[in-house]
Amino acid sequence: MRNVTLILDDGSRFHGKSFGYEKPVAGEVVFNTAMTGYPESLTDPSYAGQLMTLTYPLVGNYGVPPFTIEPNGLATFMESERIHAEAIIVSDYSEDFSHWNAVESLADWLKREQVPGITGIDTRELTKVLREHGVMMGRIVFDNVENEIDNSQLTIDNYGDINYVDRVSCKEIIVYTGKESPLHLPITTPTAQLNCQLSTVNCQLKKVVLVDCGVKTNILRCLLKRDVEVIRVPWDYDYNELEFDGLFISNGPGDPDTCDAAVQNIRRAMKNEKLPIFGICMGNQLLSKAGGAKIYKLKYGHRSHNQPVRMVGTERCFITSQNHGYAVDNTTLTEDWEPLFINMNDGSNEGIKHKRNPWFSAQFHPEAASGPTDTEFLFDEFVKLL
């Protein structure tokens, strides 16, 4: 294994060994405390632009499942078509793996996808640094390459300045019905022609426009198994002239302030006060911005399978899967909106709802993948409104 160094923005250095693809990369260094789920996390588009640190000490011992596509066009075991994280950082990588569904090692997968992996890092110490300082930019440099670079002069683009949503969103309109192969349509298709085509796909199903900010596969699956037709559109596509029954705003990476086009489209959709709207993760933030609230960056974010949230107005507490670095400022919610969920660890917002209209959202991931599915009922609540 080749020597490799993780260099943080504050000058901190962590030395380890490479077990993935060997190339220098830069990104925002974050940590995830989940014990399992690295195939799902690595393929989650919300990790785009980030160096993902796993705090669980042993990683790789159950290998990687096959990349297979179901008849409905969805990946069976992954959350997208490829790895989106810039790199993975672990304490102890297991070269040996054993699982009934594994087809290759984590190292082989990383090399094939050209994604670096570091092992031998003191991830507890790294996590403490990020916890005290907050997440920061960092770079992975390989042995002799490090000596060729003046790291004091190393410049890395700020994570919040890049529109990662634009990088991971679909570039066409994709229509899913749940069983058949999806229909792919160019975004240049005239609205009248598009509505005509959509009306012939399956007129018996309710139609949901899904704004793809970096949607996870299991979100699509959770909608489709509730017998709705999903019209997946790019993040900045103006869908307001389409004929549909509900609006879904997906998860996604980066700073929501880079997605003003999506916010403006949501505001136009909100002119129809009877239109059901549901957002998850980035969708919660964009819906909040459309409603007039402000967003702020968390010190080190929520990335784990065990985040407790309470439904406001009740004593019901749910354990949720989370992956976000930004949150809605509850104090900026206008009088028509109120918090729906609150994080029991730090009191931050975990969802909002409108007091009169059928609009609500969750900052956590009710679809899980991976993690607990305690809150998947939110998809049922949305479909009931259609």
Predicted regions and their residues:
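RNA-binding accessory domains that recognize and position tRNA/RNA substrates
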Residues: 1-199, 203-228, 232-236, 256, ...
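Cysteine-nucleophile active-site neighborhood
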Residues: 251-330, 371-381
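Short acidic/histidine-rich motifs immediately flanking catalytic phosphotransfer sites
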Residues: 242-249
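A glycine-centered loop/beta-turn motif at secondary-structure junctions
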Residues: 351-386
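Catalytic beta-strand/loop cores that center a nucleophilic Ser/Cys/Thr
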Residues: 315-357
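Active-site-proximal beta-strand elements of phosphoester/diester hydrolases
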Residues: 207-212, 320-321, 360-364
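Residue-level detector of beta-strand face positions
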Residues: 5, 308-310, 351
